[in-house]
């Protein structure tokens, strides 16, 4: 089966355009057979990858869905299973770059044809292959296509296409070659992120979350492993399988099954299942403490009193001299301690047990921006001893 592109053209129908329209029809027929959920108009799902020019500064995710349906400018690429199997050498272990409960992620090289051009160039991508046995995996696959097919932001990973063939469900993303924030904080030993890099990564992640909240989407799974880094260490949020539309009208929350990752989920959500944007803010605060300490939110191999990050850091008050003891030793004292304290105070604000007392992500973006600007005015390489 050939690769298909879904799109509509407003230009006069030349012979080339007629051929493209035939591909469009074949693509819709293919989807109706393999994943009818994606062609049901009632769900207002769309598979266009928006461009800044086409994005009308929407007020909600529903506006994006409506805009894509009316525009009908659908251009997410539909891959055949054979094409992705060939691109990954039949999903070779040598090309596997990630694995989780959903399935596995592989590095692959695909042809990248330009519309209207018979030539193509190779493109390196990431292919996520879901476990065939997982019903939940299929739901999350739909959710990813659902959201990433319409959102467009520099700090949200770009979905290039998908495959839905028989029971196979795959997603194709831009490749984030520097792996995840989690990898650099806890796993990789070849490179330590500087304090400045950590702040800039968290600022980008905050901007991505602020955008999602602006269009009324709750991410629900913010954690260091979902912050991916490209070759320039530019951060992008990934894995939208748990994302949900936010509350409407006078509703203050949406009620969902309690899912997520231990240590990152807000306590009120764990108890009640009530989901708000405040839940994402809590998770963000947890990751702020991860970049400060170089510790995971849960360290089960540590002594019992040190296993839970948020409980452990309370023993080292921010304004005390002992606070320096929790800062990641891999930073080798190369950070302005006053700025680290400010980030810790922001983290405390984010993880406030009273959800309404937490800041908005827009406030977090502003705060981190100010901290970075002030940090840049200081010597980022000075030792903590000098800064006291």
Swiss-Prot record:
It is found in: Cell membrane. Residues 91-372 form the Protein kinase domain. ATP binds at residues 97-105, 128. A lipid is attached at residue 3 (S-palmitoyl cysteine). It is a lipid-anchor. One of its GO terms (biological process) is defense response. Keywords: ATP-binding, Cell membrane, Kinase, Lipoprotein, Membrane, Nucleotide-binding, Palmitate, Plant defense, Serine/threonine-protein kinase, Transferase. It comes from the Eukaryota. InterPro entries: Kinase-like_dom_sf (IPR011009), Plant_Ser_Thr_Prot_Kinase (IPR050823), Prot_kinase_dom (IPR000719), Protein_kinase_ATP_BS (IPR017441), Ser-Thr/Tyr_kinase_cat_dom (IPR001245), Ser/Thr_kinase_AS (IPR008271). Its main location: membrane. It is an enzyme of class 2 (transferase). GO terms for cellular component: cytosol; plasma membrane. It catalyses: L-seryl-[protein] + ATP = O-phospho-L-seryl-[protein] + ADP + H(+); L-threonyl-[protein] + ATP = O-phospho-L-threonyl-[protein] + ADP + H(+). The active site is at residue 221. Belongs to the protein kinase superfamily. Ser/Thr protein kinase family. May be involved in plant defense signaling. This is Probable serine/threonine-protein kinase PBL20. It comes from Arabidopsis thaliana. The lineage of its organism: Eukaryota, Viridiplantae, Streptophyta, Embryophyta, Tracheophyta.
């Amino acid at each position: 089966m050939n690769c298909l592109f879904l799109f509509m053209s407003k230009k006069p129908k030349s012979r080339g355009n007629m051929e493209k329209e035939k591909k469009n029809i074949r693509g819709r027929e293919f989807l109706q057979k393999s994943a009818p959920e994606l062609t049901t108009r009632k769900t207002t799902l769309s598979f266009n990858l928006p461009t800044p020019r086409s994005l009308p500064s929407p007020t909600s995710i529903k506006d994006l869905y409506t805009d894509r349906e009316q525009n009908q400018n659908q251009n997410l690429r539909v891959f055949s299973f054979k094409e992705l199997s060939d691109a990954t050498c039949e999903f070779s272990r040598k090309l596997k770059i990630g694995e989780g409960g959903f399935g596995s992620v592989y590095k692959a090289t695909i042809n990248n044809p330009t519309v209207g051009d018979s030539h193509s160039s190779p493109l390196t991508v990431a292919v996520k292959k879901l476990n065939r046995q997982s019903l939940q995996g299929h739901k999350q696959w739909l959710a990813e296509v659902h959201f990433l097919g319409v959102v467009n932001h520099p700090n949200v990973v770009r979905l290039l296409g998908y495959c839905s063939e028989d029971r196979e469900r795959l997603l194709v993303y831009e490749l984030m070659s520097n792996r995840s924030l989690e990898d650099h904080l806890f796993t990789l030993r070849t490179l330590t992120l500087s304090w400045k890099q950590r702040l800039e990564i968290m600022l980008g992640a905050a901007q991505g979350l602020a955008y999602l909240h602006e269009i009324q989407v709750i991410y629900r799974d913010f954690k260091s492993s979902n912050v991916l880094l490209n070759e320039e260490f530019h951060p992008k949020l990934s894995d939208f399988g748990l994302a949900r539309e936010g509350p409407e009208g006078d509703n203050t929350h949406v009620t969902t099954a309690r899912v997520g990752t231990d240590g990152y989920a807000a306590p009120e959500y764990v108890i009640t299942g009530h989901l708000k944007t405040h839940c994402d803010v809590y998770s963000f605060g947890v990751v702020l403490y991860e970049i400060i300490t170089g510790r995971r939110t849960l360290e089960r191999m540590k002594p019992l009193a040190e296993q839970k990050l948020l409980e452990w850091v309370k023993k080292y008050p921010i304004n005390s001299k002992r606070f320096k003891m929790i800062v990641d030793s891999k930073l080798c004292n190369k950070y302005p301690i006053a700025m680290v304290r400010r980030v810790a105070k922001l983290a405390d604000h984010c993880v406030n047990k009273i959800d309404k007392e937490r800041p908005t992500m827009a406030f977090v973006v502003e705060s981190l921006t100010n901290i970075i600007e002030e940090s840049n005015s200081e010597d980022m390489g000075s030792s903590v001893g000098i800064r006291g």
